[in-house]
Amino acid sequence: MKPFTTHTGVIATLNRSNVDTDAIIPKQFLKSIKRTGYGPSAFYDWRYTADGRPDPNFELNHPRFEGRSILVTRNNFGCGSSREHAVWALVQDGYRVIIAPWKEIGEKRLPAFADIFLSNTTKNGMLCIELSETIIDAIFEQTASQPGLQATVDLTVQQLTIHGRIPATYPFQIEEGVREQLINGLDEIALSLKHEADIAAFEARRPTWMDGRD
């Protein structure tokens, strides 16, 4: 897995809440467990017209987002069924970072991302950042008035910098285990191999009757 330390890219905005995994990658593309070829199918039902042409009414098809790699969207992104294909599609469509807001309802704070989706992004080297709705609104406003707006994400110091006419920097918080995993480019297999010696020692001292060897 490619390590993630810093990333600079064009921001694209998707002004929709509760984007579920079926919207990210529809069910007809789930027949394969290969991890390749999903990029063009990301947001398929929104992205294309009935005859398969790019839909000019879908916001991510707008020319001002050409070359985008940072997606800024609304609350509860990645909800719905637990399909890792959704993350594969986003990564293969060029996204390295997704930014969304938590939502305050009374005394409750609703997370920006669905739990399983968030876990799958970490496994695939994608960074998800939670910010307040106020900050997300400001980024939407800047992006609307500044085509090709870029941002830099620095995971080492946990800062997002918007390179607008008036630059702005926002701190963010990432769970330390997730941060370490992304910075070092460790997938689940690599994480296990870090403890290879301990695993081998455990296997060596484990009683043989436990696995039916006696």
Swiss-Prot record:
| Gene Ontology terms for molecular function | 3-isopropylmalate dehydratase activity
Q: Which residues form a coiled coil?
A: none
What Enzyme Commission number(s) apply to this enzyme? 4.2.1.33
Q: Name one GO biological process term.
A: L-leucine biosynthetic process
Q: Name one GO cellular component term.
A: 3-isopropylmalate dehydratase complex
Q: Which InterPro entries match?
A: 3-IsopropMal_deHydase_ssu, Aconitase/3IPM_dehydase_swvl, AconitaseA/IPMdHydase_ssu_swvl, IPMI_Swivel, LeuD
| Catalytic reaction list | (2R,3S)-3-isopropylmalate = (2S)-2-isopropylmalate
Q: Which pathway, metabolic or otherwise, does it act in?
A: Amino-acid biosynthesis; L-leucine biosynthesis; L-leucine from 3-methyl-2-oxobutanoate: step 2/4
* Keywords, comma-separated and alphabetical: Amino-acid biosynthesis, Branched-chain amino acid biosynthesis, Leucine biosynthesis, Lyase
Q: Name one Pfam family in it.
A: Aconitase_C
PANTHER family cross-referenced by the UniProt entry: 3-ISOPROPYLMALATE DEHYDRATASE SMALL SUBUNIT, 3-ISOPROPYLMALATE DEHYDRATASE SMALL SUBUNIT 2-RELATED-RELATED
State the family it belongs to.
Belongs to the LeuD family. LeuD type 1 subfamily.
Subunit composition?
Heterodimer of LeuC and LeuD.
Role summary: Catalyzes the isomerization between 2-isopropylmalate and 3-isopropylmalate, via the formation of 2-isopropylmaleate.
Which protein are we looking at? 3-isopropylmalate dehydratase small subunit
Query: What is the species of this protein?
Result: Desulforapulum autotrophicum (strain ATCC 43914 / DSM 3382 / VKM B-1955 / HRM2)
Q: What is the lineage of its organism?
A: Bacteria, Pseudomonadati, Thermodesulfobacteriota, Desulfobacteria, Desulfobacterales
